[in-house]
Amino acid sequence: MNYVNILEKSKNFIELELVNDDHSLSNLIKEVLLSKKGVILASYGVEHPVLDPDTGRYISNPTIMLKTDEKTDAEKVLKEALKDIVDLCNKTLKEL
């Protein structure tokens, strides 16, 4: 089973679904995307979550939407944002 499903994709727009997740990662990705040059819209939506009896977490399948200007490739910006998040996590691990 995939963790990420691409729902729609073009040069300047991408919408993806995170399977069995909550607000945490979606919100982080959105915030980093909003700091990127060429991003017109970065948002996410979460339908009503359900309680996972195994983990005690409320989960859903959040969708992340990214729209860029015509000069900016949406997939490239998304990959840059994800790399920035990984770099931040690695930096934090080194400092602990």
UniProtKB/Swiss-Prot annotation:
* Recorded catalytic activity of this chain's protein: RNA(n) + a ribonucleoside 5'-triphosphate = RNA(n+1) + diphosphate
Q: Indicate where this protein resides in the cell.
A: Cytoplasm
Lineage, top-rank taxon, reads: Archaea
Which molecular function GO terms apply here? Answer: DNA binding; DNA-directed RNA polymerase activity; protein dimerization activity
Q: Which InterPro entries match?
A: RBP11-like, RBP11-like_dimer, RNA_pol_Rpb11_13-16kDa_CS, Rpo11-like
For this protein, the Enzyme Commission number is 2.7.7.6
Please tell me whether the keyword ATP-binding is annotated for this protein: no
The answer to keyword S-adenosyl-L-methionine applying to this record is no
What's the main place this protein lives?
cytoplasm
Which processes are annotated in GO (biological process)? DNA-templated transcription
Keywords attached to this Swiss-Prot or TrEMBL record, sorted alphabetically, are: Cytoplasm, DNA-directed RNA polymerase, Nucleotidyltransferase, Transcription, Transferase
Q: What class of enzyme is it?
A: transferase
* Family from the record: Belongs to the archaeal Rpo11/eukaryotic RPB11/RPC19 RNA polymerase subunit family.
Q: How does it assemble?
A: Part of the RNA polymerase complex.
Q: What is this protein called?
A: DNA-directed RNA polymerase subunit Rpo11
